[in-house]
């Protein structure tokens, strides 16, 4: 049993800035950061809102590929949440897709204080090979990759078992275990465990008294 309930308080979080290119980041990467990437409509915005307990923090769009900027949110205790552009949506041109993938690659190569890369994937979809490659790249760069299977509440028990089996197979394929969370932003399932994981990984769990629910 976790020492915190699912309502474990998370640091107060506010929108900080957006950048279109990595050369605009200046000293944004001088503080600890966690980043969220995933295909369009993977549930990134909903997750950020649930994680921060701030419904309007990240705007949820029904239009695939709406997020094309790197959006940075900063917590009261000084670490960044970085929302990376969605990718892989069908309406994007080949050039747009390539540009976004280059942006993601450049981010992994240049963001100095990146501690965790969260890779989101809708539980109703198969886990793409491209994401496995991203996990391997992150590991090579000493960045902790963490997979989040979102919208887990949309599946019945059989479907959830299939997703877990799929992730076990993915770990076997690359030969290295990685952390996986099964999350529902709408019901709150897994949110408390995710908050706890973030605070412990960043070494700020002792500052719980300074955060707000």
Curated annotation (Swiss-Prot):
The keyword GTP-binding applies. GTP binds at residues 38-45, 65-69, 83-86, 150-153, 183-185. GO terms for cellular component: cytosol. One of its GO terms (molecular function) is metal ion binding. Disulfide bonds: none annotated. Residues 30-204 form the EngB-type G domain. Coiled coil: none annotated. Its cofactor is Mg(2+). Mg(2+) binds at residues 45, 67. SUPFAM superfamilies: P-loop containing nucleoside triphosphate hydrolases. CDD domains: YihA_EngB. One of its GO terms (biological process) is division septum assembly. Keywords: Cell cycle, Cell division, GTP-binding, Magnesium, Metal-binding, Nucleotide-binding, Septation. Belongs to the TRAFAC class TrmE-Era-EngA-EngB-Septin-like GTPase superfamily. EngB GTPase family. This is Probable GTP-binding protein EngB. It comes from Leptospira biflexa serovar Patoc (strain Patoc 1 / ATCC 23582 / Paris). The gene is engB.
């Amino acid at each position: 049993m976790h020492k915190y309930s699912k309502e474990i308080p998370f640091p107060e979080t506010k929108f900080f800035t957006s950048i279109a290119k990595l050369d605009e980041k200046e000293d944004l990467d001088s503080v600890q950061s966690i980043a969220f990437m995933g295909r369009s409509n993977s549930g990134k915005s909903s997750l950020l809102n649930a994680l921060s307990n701030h419904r309007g923090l990240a705007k949820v769009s029904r239009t695939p590929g709406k997020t094309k900027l790197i959006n940075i949110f900063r917590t009261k205790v000084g670490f960044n949440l970085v929302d990376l552009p969605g990718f892989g949506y069908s309406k994007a041109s080949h050039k747009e897709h390539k540009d976004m993938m280059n942006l993601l690659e450049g981010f992994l190569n240049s963001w100095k204080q990146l501690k965790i890369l969260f890779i989101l994937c809708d539980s109703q979809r198969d886990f793409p090979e491209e994401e496995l490659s991203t996990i391997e790249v992150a590991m090579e760069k000493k960045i902790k990759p963490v997979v989040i299977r979102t919208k887990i509440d949309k599946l019945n028990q059989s479907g959830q078992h299939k997703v877990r089996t799929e992730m076990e197979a993915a770990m076997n394929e690359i030969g290295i275990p990685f952390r996986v969370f099964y999350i529902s932003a709408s019901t709150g399932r897994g949110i408390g465990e995710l908050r706890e994981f973030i605070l412990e990984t960043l070494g700020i769990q002792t500052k719980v008294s300074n955060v707000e629910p």
